[in-house]
Amino acid sequence: MTALKNSFNRLGCVLLGAFLSGSALAQTPDVQVTEPGFKVFQFPKNQIPRIDGSFADWDVVPDRHVVPIEEMWDDSRKHQGINKSTLDIKVKVGWVEGLNRLYFYYEAYDDFWDFNTLGLRNDTYEIVVDADLSGGPHIDQFRHNQEALTRFESFFLHQNVHAQNYHIMTPPTEGKSWTMVWGPQQWLKDLPYANYAYDYNFKHGEDGVLKFEFYITPFDYASPDGGPAASTESKLYEGKKIGLCWAVIDYDGGPGNNGFWNLSKHHKMYGNASMQRLFTLMPLEAQFRKPIEAKW
């Protein structure tokens, strides 16, 4: 009798285990922004980057804060690995206490700079920011309740509202805006919420190095129809963790792109803030603190 009871117990455990395993397999785990992440350098208040195209202000940023192309991958799978003789990228990100701005320094070498049309087709640095880690979809294509809301309705309700996407032209064709804000909040790309400066010496189809600095202002709520007055800036402070990601869309003269170099392992990070990378707003470096602060 005891042996029979033990057999039933073992059978029950097996069936329960199979049920739980099947349930777990049937559920797709939610993607999340997790460690390991990257560091956002804190500029001293008397060394705020001047957006002037000289870039000397960025010399104080240590190399450990640089995000190189080695952190990215071509998720279009046109390239099996990194070849710096055709494309090389490095990015620095900074912030300043008291200003709700994210500063960027972008430097890239390309063997074929593509920027001769007025359409969206352009060598592009695409960035997405979710400064309160609210996560989830923020473009109409990935909207919830797709049976109730059309893409058109969702665009004017949700697009770029809790996380923002910028398609930055590197560099822009003459006559074209420096960035496409992917939503109705076009004021995001203008002063005082953004500014930019480029430096390059090449023409379309040539190789060379582009240097570019800019800042943007992240918003926890960027009103789709009420403008800045109806919107809520993200509050930036020391130690805060934010969602941030980027991709480089490389064109080389052909009909389509020649690579989508992504900082995220998820291709759809451009429209789902849960697929971004984690960035932490760092304290001042020791040499910029007062002596008592450095000891503390």
For each predicted feature, which ranges?
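Bacterial N-terminal signal peptides that target proteins for export
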Residues: 2-15
